[in-house]
Amino acid sequence: MTTTLLPRKALHITAMALPLAGWTLHTTVLHRRLTAAHRDPLTTTWRREAFTTRAQRLLERHSDEVVLVLADADHFKELNDRHGHAAGDTALAAIGARLTEWAGPRGVAGRLGGDEFAALARIEPRHQTLRLEHLARLMTRPVPYEDGSLPLAVSLGAATPAAVASSDLPTLMRAADAAMYEGKYTGDVVRARPDHARVPSVNGRRAGRRGAAVRGRAA
């Protein structure tokens, strides 16, 4: 009697498990597709909206130990004109990968558009200077390309809530953007001061900056 019942129970359990397994697979695939939709396909960093959502969440939870960095590729048009668009894409992918590496698993990196990126990293205040210096070195390393390498130059601006007396993300981005512009083409990370946060802005960006006037007005 027992011998005949066990196979039937096993079959019944298997039959019940099949729809569950199918639903789990469907959910996993759906999650991957949704995640991919929020990622920039070239650099695999987060798109602007997804980056903003995650950065705001980090700021709400860890405002005492975060650093926001804005990065802008220098001489990018010249690189494209000289080496071709494939080389430009390779350089952008390298910037995204290096920012993601620098931000680490507890941080977030995103592509804001074109050759502009942002990263928010959790770093204890006593380690922030060293980590920013490391980022500057990281961004000057040549990018392997075909049988050689591409030169890479990136302008960097950094802002912390303590430095600008605000944990508001648009304020931090405005300050980091103004600091980055101040140190354009130097290869250094310029750290934002309180006055950088008061620079007139459009959509949280320094007024007059490329792309700042889209769907916004000066603040």
Region annotations inferred by a language model:
Residues 1, 217-219:
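Non-catalytic regulatory/interaction regions at protein termini and inter-domain linkers
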Residues 2-41, 49-59, 65:
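Signal-transducing coiled-coil linker helices
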Residues 35-53, 71-84, 93:
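Conserved nucleotide-binding and Mg2+-coordinating catalytic segments in signaling enzymes
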Residues 51, 55, 91-92, 96-99, ...:
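Heptad-repeat coiled-coil signal-transmission/dimerization helices
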Residues 54-83, 110, 150, 216:
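Active-site-proximal structural segments of metal-dependent nucleotidyl cyclase/transferase enzymes
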Residues 96-162:
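GGDEF/GGEEF active-site signature
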Residues 148-179, 195:
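A short glycine-enriched loop-to-beta-strand structural element that forms part of the catalytic core
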Residues 171-217:
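Catalytic/regulatory signature loops of cyclic-dinucleotide turnover enzymes
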